A protein has these predicted regions:
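N-terminal [4Fe-4S]-dependent radical SAM core
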Residues: 5-94
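Conserved C-terminal portion of the radical SAM core fold
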Residues: 177-178
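Conserved SAM/AdoMet-binding glycine-rich loop
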Residues: 87-174
Length: 178
């Protein structure tokens, strides 16, 4: 029964479905999103569209909790995993590329980093990629389709507004049509 299945995602404490609860139902265990920094840039920061960045984005590309880009992915993963396990002892992981625009780069670099991230630990169950609407291409779509066949894949698409005037005000670098 669809309604019954849907209601199973709610808890007695919360009348909405949290991501934590969704993951527990999907994977059967606590899931940690390990925020990795692939040392990507952003076309709204590197001069392609602008060098100012969006008004809400920090110097670290809003990846303030991601790993240090000067460290290897292995070291970033290990350090963040150890920190998470100080609070929660058991769980599996989603490799999370959060900082900057993680589909903005040569396709070979993207493929290498994403595939490497999936191999960092035997308990990685998925990949989460943060990006923006104007950084997709047919090659990116093909790569995402390949990754989706291999693992649980989510794309975080930064949609800050549906109003062109607001997008311009916040220096988003694209319009609603994008």
């Amino acid at each position: 029964n669809l309604i019954g299945d849907f209601m199973n995602y709610f808890t007695n404490e919360k009348h909405y479905n949290t991501l934590n609860n969704y993951y527990r139902h999907k994977f059967g265990i606590k899931i940690f999103k390990i925020a990795l920094n692939g040392n990507f840039s952003c076309p709204n920061r590197d001069g392609v569209f602008s060098s100012q960045g969006c008004i809400f984005c920090s110097e670290s590309g809003s990846g303030d909790f991601a790993g240090d880009p000067s460290m290897s992915l292995e070291k970033q993963f290990k350090d963040i995993k150890e920190m998470m396990h100080k609070k929660w002892h058991k769980g599996k992981y989603i490799a999370y590329f959060q900082a900057n625009t993680n589909t903005y780069g040569p396709i070979k670099k993207l493929r290498t980093l994403f595939e490497k991230a999936l191999e960092l630990d035997e308990n990685i169950v998925g990949l989460n990629i943060g990006t923006i609407a104007d950084c997709f291409s047919p090659q990116i779509y093909d790569l995402l389709e390949e990754l989706n066949q291999k693992t649980y894949l989510t794309i975080e698409l930064g949609l800050q507004s549906m109003h062109d005037q607001t997008l311009k005000l916040i220096n988003r670098g694209h319009d609603l049509q994008t």
